[in-house]
Swiss-Prot record:
Keyword Oxidoreductase attributed: no
Keywords for this protein: Cytoplasm, DNA damage, DNA repair, Endonuclease, Hydrolase, Nuclease
GO biological process: DNA modification; mismatch repair
Gene Ontology molecular function terms on file: DNA binding; endonuclease activity
Top-rank taxon: Bacteria
Metal-binding found in the keyword field: no
The species this protein was found in: Escherichia coli O17:K52:H18 (strain UMN026 / ExPEC)
Record-level GO cellular component terms: cytoplasm
Role noted for this protein: Sequence-specific endonuclease that cleaves unmethylated GATC sequences. It is involved in DNA mismatch repair.
HAMAP family: MutH
Gene transcribed to yield this protein: mutH
Primary localization class, coarse: cytoplasm
Locations listed in the record: Cytoplasm
Name under which the protein is recorded: DNA mismatch repair protein MutH
Length: 229
């Protein structure tokens, strides 16, 4: 079997993207890094996004940190998801930054969250810390769109959370709000403040927030598609 090679340009079809992702299944991160001419860090403490960057290189992703999807031409977002030995997610999944101002007229249908989750290529990766980073294997990919029930679940949480933001209650939002979708601070340091609406409608400064999918949502999603018991 010939070794896979990174895509040098963005994939032109979903089929090409999925076929390339399937070729990576079973390889370790160390093997994929070496084949791409990259050095594998000892751990992810200083390189938190390294796995995502590695897989973006292999799959020809184009967006980087821009607001559009990773595969903008296909409308597909790439999400790597660390899993345990039973294939269950080990952490929540970042979706996008939560807008804290300028939200008048925004609906679920036009929201950034829905745009990012419209079509997702999920790639599970072994994530248990007992496995050295270079030895963690890449799992089988899944190309997913939310079904009617999943869309409803996400919409209800999004509407509840956005109502709180618009009504000046952003500081009262905790990770427990939302059944499947949560908002929590997203900042490398506590000095990175952004504008938001306060309880009396005034402008306040607060930590940037991000939308995250809770583990119960991604766990059910993976279990249903991979028949994990």
């Amino acid at each position: 079997m010939s070794q896979p090679r990174p895509l040098l340009s963005p994939p032109e079809t979903e089929e090409q993207l999925l076929a390339q992702a399937q070729q990576l299944s079973g390889y370790t991160l160390g093997e994929l890094a070496a084949l791409a001419g990259l050095v594998t860090p000892e751990n992810l403490k200083r390189d938190k996004g390294w796995i995502g960057v590695l897989l973006e290189i292999w799959l020809g992703a184009s967006a980087g940190s821009k607001p559009e999807q990773d595969f903008a031409g296909l409308g597909v977002e790439l999400k790597t998801i660390p899993v345990d030995s039973l294939g269950r997610p080990l952490e929540t999944t970042f979706v996008c930054v939560a807008p804290l101002t300028g939200n008048s007229g925004v609906t679920w249908e036009t929201s950034h969250v829905r745009h990012k989750l419209k079509r997702v290529l999920w790639i599970p990766v072994e994530g248990e810390r007992s496995i050295p980073l270079a030895q963690r294997r890449v799992g089988s990919p899944l190309l997913w769109s939310p079904n009617e029930e999943e869309d409803r679940q996400l919409r209800e949480d999004w509407e509840e959370l956005m109502d709180m933001i618009v009504l000046g209650q952003v500081e009262r939002i905790t990770a427990r709000h939302g059944e499947y979708l949560q908002i929590r601070p997203k900042a490398a340091n506590a000095k990175a403040l952004t504008e938001a609406i306060g309880a009396r409608g005034e402008r306040i400064l607060t930590l940037p927030r991000g939308f995250y999918l809770k583990k119960n949502f991604t766990s059910a999603l993976l279990a249903r598609h991979f028949l994990i018991q």
